[in-house]
Amino acid sequence: MEQLSFDISRSSKSRIIASSGVFQIELLDHAGEEDFPQLIEISKHLAKEYGDHAVLTKATICRYFNKPGSLPFIARYRNEIIGYIIGIPVKDIHSEPWARLDENFGKANTLYTYAFVVLSKYKGHGYAKMLKRVYLNWAKKKDGIRFITGHVKAGISKNFT
């Protein structure tokens, strides 16, 4: 059984990857307690579409955002987190029943897009598109990753042409 480490520090550690005026995208090296409330609040918007299991907790933030090999990005507007996207190697979520259905399960070559959300009031400004593009570009450069997968709501992908 995998042992979870709850090394929770107060401060997040991140690197700014892209910015434009008051908007920026950061690659999270470590999600700290200071950002937990914003991440949890934003994740509540996923519950409307995907159910309560999509709402983040301290445990899921530590498990996925701080996991070696994961690819978590946050979007900030005027220093407030307005969205995030996180990729996790499929091999690292083997306990999820649906992960075993992935055609590349067990090959250690696939990144699963675990969650992607931008607050509604910031949609229509290109922030979600920029966040997704940065994520995809970084995912393509990750050693050993050949495929990127995930679950999306029907019709949503047409917004990312």
Predicted features, each with a name:
Residues N159-T161:
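Conserved active-site tyrosine of GNAT-family acetyltransferases
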Residues I8-T60, K67, P72-Y77, I81-I82:
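Short amphipathic alpha-helix that is part of the acyltransferase structural core
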Residues A115-V118, G124-W138:
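Conserved acetyl-CoA-binding loop-helix of GNAT-fold acetyltransferases
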Residues A139-A154:
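Conserved GNAT acetyl-CoA-binding A-motif
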Residues T60-C62, L71-P72, P97-N104:
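Short secondary-structure capping micro-motifs at structural edges
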Residues L46, P89-I93, I156:
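Feature marks short, surface-exposed loop/turn motifs that line or immediately flank catalytic pockets
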Residues I81, I85-A115:
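Conserved acyl-donor/pantetheine-binding loop and adjacent beta-alpha core of acyl/acetyltransferases
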